Structure formats: structure tokens, C-alpha cells
């Protein structure tokens, strides 16, 4: 990826949760301030840095240096990269390492990595010694705009994604936009799907801005920081109103009911990154909304066109290996969606669209129209 165009002073977004509220600090090179911010937040604390091998190569030394500069002790806990670490075995590894390192309740866990590391480290922090505070240092675009904010932590089960976990808010989020320069184009695009999601579900003006500025976001600088800050503000506002996802927060799952099933169907593998699953899932949700008469075909096409223009998959046939390996059939995908966290009394709940910028929660969706819709999309050869 090319060098950033320009950059400005850090942006701070507040997650307003009373005495459990925290700041998201966004900007280029803000990782350098990690030590001073932690020292002010938790004087005398030791830290354990949970990261994966790939991130450790690029950013562990710099993170430890920022802590060393103010005399903060840090101990690295390195897991394998990829969704496979977000498992019972990965959780056991991190928990046992935290206990062995004698990390106490006045110390801090630092999650240095993408969504997998953040979810895993946050969940481990929530259960070791009945709760350790933790700091999110997200190193992927997806993690900076989504998974590091709002306190959802957890691991996957063989039955599905994110089925074991807890709500556990961080005490600080440091979103350094410079670290995104080390992402592959595919990783960056996958994170962009979550950025586009915020426009699609609740802010048409932001979506239009993304349509006009997505190339500048890729290049970096102030457009990238604006996109991240706008996304974080949108999520922070919803989390402040509905922390435990009893209502409005479910809107943030636009694209995720279909997307999570597709991730499970591809074995949580590199065939389909999470953000890519969300992209395909959002388009499917929009098309299903149009079939139900809720959304215009033009609006569904607008969403699909923008995601495709960025380089994201928008059709089931775009999933890597579809032609060679195929995908689960409609019945198998329905079975995977039946494990979705939004299912109530066995009935499916979908996040659908009435317009670009207006999502709604659709309860008690009949399964047969969904199964028929998926069967047609799987058979689509266009």
C-alpha cells in the first residue's frame, strides 16, 4: 500500500458507559503514546501483551518500547495467527499464560492484533481471576472500526462462530492508523466491509462519502482517519444505548447472519475472511430485503456495486474455491444460521434494509423463503 497523503492530530471518540466508559484514540503513530496513557490510567500496573506471530513480527517490539519508555513491565503471549486460535485450545493457552505470569487484577492485558486476538485476549481477561482489565490495540482495519469497540469477546465453537464469550469492555482503545500500512490489500478490503456497513445501516450521507472517497481511504491520511472515526462514533453511540444487545445493537449485525454461516461453511479458513463474509452477507441481506418488498432493487444494486468497486466479493460464486469445492447447500446453510446468536425460540432474526442508511430488525422470519432464496443464489450462474 502507498504512503499516506497526510495526517492530523489524534482523534478521540468516547464510549459513554458511565464509570465503565473509555476512549478510542485514533491517529497515525498513536501507538507511541501507549505507555504514557497506560501509566496515567493504571499507575504501577504490569502488562501482558497477547498477540499473534504475524503481528509480533511487525509491532511487538515497538509496543514494548512504548511501555519500556515509562517503566512498564510487559510480558508477551504469542499465539498462532488466524481464526484457529479463537478456540478452546487458544483460550486455554492464553489463560494459563496469564496465570503463570502472575498477572493480577490491578494489572492489564493488552490485545495487540486483529479481531481474533482482540476477541481471544478480551475473553481470557474476562475470566482469569474473575476479571482483568484490558486494553485493545487493534492492528487491522476491521478490528479498529468494529471488534475492538463495544466489549464483545469470545471464541468459536465447532457449532458456529462466537458462540462462547462474554461482554467485557476494554479500558482503552489505541487505533494507530499507521499499522494499517502493513496489511495486505485483501486484509484492508475485508476491514472496509465493516466501514461500509455503518453507512448502509444508519448513515446514507456517510455511505455516499465512502462512494466518493474510498480510493483516498486506501491511500491513507485524513480520509482514512475520518472513515475510522466516523465508524467508531456510530458504533459507540449504539453501544452506549444498548450495551448488551437487547435491541438496537443487533443492527450492527447487518450481513452477519448470512456471513457467519458462510464462514462456518468454508471452515473459518482463508477461503473467506470475516469482512468478506460480511460483504457477501450484506448484499444477500439487501437482495432478500428487495424480494420482500422492503428495499428498492436500485438500492440493493447500489450497495453491491460499491462493495464490488472496492474489490470485495458480493456473490456466493465470488468465494474462493466456489467453482472447485462448491459450498454447503441451502439446507446446510440454514442449519448453520440456526445457531446464530439472534435466534429466539428457534426462529430466525435478520437485519434487513429499508433504504441505504436505514436498517431494521426482522424477527420471526419464516425459514422457507430464506431457504428458497439461498438455493437460487447458489444456483446463480450469471
UniProtKB/Swiss-Prot annotation:
Function of the molecule: Catalyzes the conversion of 3-deoxy-D-arabino-heptulosonate 7-phosphate (DAHP) to dehydroquinate (DHQ).
The protein's Enzyme Commission number: 4.2.3.4
Residues reported in the UniProt entry to bind Zn(2+): 194, 256, 274
Cofactor list: Co(2+); Zn(2+); NAD(+)
GO CC terms: cytoplasm
Top-level lineage group: Bacteria
InterPro entries recorded: Dehydroquinate_synthase, DHQ_synth_AroB, DHQ_synth_fam, DHQS/DOIS_N, DHQS_C
Positions bound to NAD(+): 115-119, 139-140, 152, 161
Enzyme class name: lyase
Protein name, entry field: 3-dehydroquinate synthase
Pathway linked to the protein: Metabolic intermediate biosynthesis; chorismate biosynthesis; chorismate from D-erythrose 4-phosphate and phosphoenolpyruvate: step 2/7
One Pfam assignment: DHQS_C
Family recorded in the similarity comment: Belongs to the sugar phosphate cyclases superfamily. Dehydroquinate synthase family.
Compartment list: Cytoplasm
Keywords: Amino-acid biosynthesis, Aromatic amino acid biosynthesis, Cobalt, Cytoplasm, Lyase, Metal-binding, NAD, Nucleotide-binding, Zinc
Amino acid at each position: 500500500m502507498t504512503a499516506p497523503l497526510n495526517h492530523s492530530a489524534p482523534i478521540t471518540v468516547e464510549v459513554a458507559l458511565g464509570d465503565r466508559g473509555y476512549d478510542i484514540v485514533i491517529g497515525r503513530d498513536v501507538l507511541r503514546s501507549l505507555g504514557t496513557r497506560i501509566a496515567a490510567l493504571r499507575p504501577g500496573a504490569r502488562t501482558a501483551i497477547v498477540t499473534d506471530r504475524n503481528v509480533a513480527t511487525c509491532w511487538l517490539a515497538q509496543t514494548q518500547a512504548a511501555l519500556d519508555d515509562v517503566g512498564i513491565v510487559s510480558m508477551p503471549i504469542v499465539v498462532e495467527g488466524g481464526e484457529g486460535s479463537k478456540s478452546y485450545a487458544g483460550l486455554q493457552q492464553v489463560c494459563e499464560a496469564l496465570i503463570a505470569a502472575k498477572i493480577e487484577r490491578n494489572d492489564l492485558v493488552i490485545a495487540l492484533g486483529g479481531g481474533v486476538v482482540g476477541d481471544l485476549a478480551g475473553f481470557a481477561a474476562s475470566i482469569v481471576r474473575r476479571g482483568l482489565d484490558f486494553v485493545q490495540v487493534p492492528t487491522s482495519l476491521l478490528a479498529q472500526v468494529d471488534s475492538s469497540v463495544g466489549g464483545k469477546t469470545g471464541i468459536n465453537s465447532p457449532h458456529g462462530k462466537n458462540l462462547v464469550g462474554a461482554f467485557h469492555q476494554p479500558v482503552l482503545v489505541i487505533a494507530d492508523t499507521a499499522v494499517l500500512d502493513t496489511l495486505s490489500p485483501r486484509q484492508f478490503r475485508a476491514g472496509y466491509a465493516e466501514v461500509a456497513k455503518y453507512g448502509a445501516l444508519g448513515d446514507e450521507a456517510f455511505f455516499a462519502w465512502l462512494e466518493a472517497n474510498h480510493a483516498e481511504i486506501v491511500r491513507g491520511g485524513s480520509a482514512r482517519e475520518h472513515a475510522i472515526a466516523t465508524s467508531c462514533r456510530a458504533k459507540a453511540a449504539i453501544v452506549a444505548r444498548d450495551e448488551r444487545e437487547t435491541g438496537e445493537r443487533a443492527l450492527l449485525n447487518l450481513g452477519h447472519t448470512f456471513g457467519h454461516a458462510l464462514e462456518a461453511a468454508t471452515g473459518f479458513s482463508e477461503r473467506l475472511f470475516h469482512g468478506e463474509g460480511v460483504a457477501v452477507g450484506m448484499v444477500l441481506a439487501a437482495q432478500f430485503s428487495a424480494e420482500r418488498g422492503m428495499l428498492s432493487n436500485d438500492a440493493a444494486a447500489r450497495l453491491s456495486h460499491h462493495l464490488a468497486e472496492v474489490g470485495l466479493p458480493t456473490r456466493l460464486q465470488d468465494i474462493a474455491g466456489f467453482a472447485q469445492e462448491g459450498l454447503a447447500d441451502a439446507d446446510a446453510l440454514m442449519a448453520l444460521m440456526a445457531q446464530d446468536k439472534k435466534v429466539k425460540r428457534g426462529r430466525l432474526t435478520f437485519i434487513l434494509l429499508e433504504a441505504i442508511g436505514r436498517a431494521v430488525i426482522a424477527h420471526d422470519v419464516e425459514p422457507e423463503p430464506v431457504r428458497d432464496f439461498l438455493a437460487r443464489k447458489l444456483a446463480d450462474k450469471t
